[in-house]
A protein has these predicted regions:
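Short amphipathic alpha-helical interaction/hinge segments
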Residues: 93, 100, 177-181
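Conserved N-terminal diphosphate/IPP-binding helix and adjacent helical/loop segment
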Residues: 1-88, 95, 99-130
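All-alpha helical catalytic cores of prenyl diphosphate-utilizing isoprenoid enzymes
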Residues: 24, 28-38, 51-61, 135-147, ...
Length: 181
């Protein structure tokens, strides 16, 4: 590997660490909030944090970050939060994709739907464990998306720019969902 490629890989690794730190902070705050509700809420928010931080290259957030920086942007702290929000949207789409594909593994780890299907079956509940796991997965995915939108809406960037970005993001999600792949 040449030195420029090594440099790029190293820069991406440093960036990933920054995004993961912010992702962890965002999700820790949500886990703390979930403590006001049920243990199950805490558990699935913790599971959301775990799947958000496991592997992944953080390419989508890096595109946001480096586009901003190359365009002259200087607010490092805020753009890292925005990049983390974009990763959360990606996680939301992966959780939904796992549900739609009836997947049991993602990146070598159990999916949300599989984790909670197994939890339900282990606890000997009488109703359908697959349905329970899928229900939790859909809810966790939607929560993830809304956390991302909260991060975007609460950023210190110009509200009109945020509005445009959220609309563009939503349009991309709609297009992806309407195509059904």
């Amino acid at each position: 590997m040449n030195s420029k490629a090594q440099q790029a890989k190293q820069s991406l690794g440093i960036f990933k660490e920054k995004v993961d730190l912010v992702l962890g902070e965002i999700l820790d705050k949500e886990i703390k909030e979930a403590e006001n509700y049920t243990q199950l809420a805490v558990d699935y928010m913790t599971e959301l944090k775990n799947i958000s931080l496991v592997s992944g290259k953080r390419l989508r957030p890096s595109f946001v970050y480096y586009t901003y920086k190359l365009s002259g942007g200087r607010n490092e702290e805020e753009i890292i939060k925005i990049a983390a929000a974009i990763e959360l949207v990606h996680v939301f789409l992966l959780v939904e994709d796992d549900f739609m594909d009836i997947a049991s593994k993602r990146r070598g780890y159990p999916t949300i739907n599989e984790t909670y299907r197994l939890w339900h079956a282990k606890n000997l509940y009488k109703k359908d464990s697959t349905h329970f796991g899928n229900t939790i997965a859909v809810n966790v995915g939607l929560i993830c998306d809304h956390i991302a939108l909260n991060v975007l809406n609460n950023s210190n960037f110009d509200l009109e720019l945020i509005k445009k970005a959220v609309n563009q993001l939503n349009n991309q999600i709609i297009i992806k969902k309407v195509k059904f792949r």
